[in-house]
C-alpha cells in the first residue's frame, strides 16, 4: 500500500525526489535490478584476488570470450558487475580511462581505491541529476599492488564494491547480484584469511553449488585470478572446467 501511495504522489518518478519516509524510490528500484543480475563472488586471498562470476546458461551461438564477465581495467585491476550490462560497460570504460590517465600523468599505476572512488563519484552524481536515472549496476573491483603495501597503504590485495548510491567499501570477500545475501551469509561462515587462489575459487564454487542446487553447472562460470608474480601483476582468466 505504501508503494502505491508513493507512486500516486509521483515520488517514484524522479531520482532527485525524496519520499516522505526518507527513501529515494528510483534508487531502490535500481537496487532491485541488480538482484536480477547474475551473481559474482570476490575473495581476497594470500597475495591475490579471485573473482568467480555466473554467466547463467551457456549459449552455443555466443562466442565464449565475448561473454566473459571478468573485465581488465589495468594490468593490476579487474572488475565484474551485476545489473544492466550496458550501464556496466560505460563505467568499465570510464575506469580504464581513469587508470590510463593516471599512468600518463604520473608515470605510475593508479591505486585501486582511486579508480573505484572516481567510478563511485559518477554513480553518486546520477542520484542527483534531474532527467537521468541512476546506474542500474553494482561493481566489484579487485586490485593488487606489485612489490608491497605502499600504494594501497593497507595490504597487497584489495577488493572493493560500489553500490547504486555511489558508496564504496573494502571487503575481505563479497557477493553481488542474484541471491547476494544468501551468498554473503555463507561467506561469513566459511571465509578464512590467507587462502590460496585455488582455495578461493574452490570456496566460491562450493557456495554457488549450494545456493543453485540442481541448476549448478561448472560451464556457467567465469573466473579471474589477479596475483603478483616476479614483482609484476598477472591476470589469469578461466572458464568452465578450467576452474576445477
Segments from the language model and where they lie:
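Long, low-complexity N-terminal extensions
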Residues: 1-244
Amino acid at each position: 500500500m505504501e508503494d502505491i501511495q508513493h507512486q500516486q504522489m509521483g515520488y517514484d518518478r524522479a531520482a532527485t525526489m525524496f519520499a516522505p519516509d526518507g527513501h529515494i524510490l528510483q534508487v531502490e528500484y535500481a537496487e532491485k535490478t541488480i538482484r536480477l543480475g547474475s551473481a559474482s563472488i570476490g575473495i581476497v586471498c594470500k597475495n591475490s584476488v579471485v573473482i568467480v562470476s555466473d554467466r547463467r546458461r551457456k549459449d552455443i551461438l555466443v562466442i565464449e570470450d565475448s561473454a566473459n564477465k571478468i573485465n581488465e581495467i589495468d594490468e593490476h585491476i579487474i572488475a565484474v558487475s551485476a545489473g544492466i550490462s550496458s550501464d556496466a560497460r560505460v563505467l568499465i570504460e570510464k575506469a580504464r580511462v581513469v587508470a590510463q590517465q593516471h599512468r600518463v600523468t604520473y608515470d605510475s599505476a593508479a591505486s585501486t581505491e582511486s579508480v573505484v572512488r572516481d567510478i563511485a563519484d559518477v554513480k553518486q552524481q546520477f542520484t542527483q541529476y534531474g532527467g537521468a536515472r541512476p546506474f542500474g549496476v553494482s561493481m566489484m573491483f579487485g586490485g593488487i599492488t606489485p612489490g608491497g603495501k605502499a600504494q594501497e597503504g593497507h595490504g597487497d590485495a584489495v577488493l572493493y564494491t560500489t553500490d547504486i548510491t555511489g558508496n564504496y567499501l573494502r571487503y575481505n570477500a563479497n557477493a553481488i547480484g542474484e541471491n547476494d545475501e544468501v551468498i554473503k551469509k555463507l561467506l561469513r561462515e566459511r571465509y578464512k584469511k590467507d587462502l590460496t587462489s585455488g582455495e578461493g575459487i574452490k570456496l566460491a564454487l562450493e557456495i554457488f553449488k549450494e545456493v543453485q542446487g540442481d541448476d549448478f553447472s561448472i560451464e556457467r562460470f567465469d573466473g579471474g585470478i589477479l596475483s603478483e608474480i616476479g614483482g609484476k601483476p598477472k591476470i589469469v582468466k578461466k572458464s568452465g572446467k578450467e576452474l576445477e
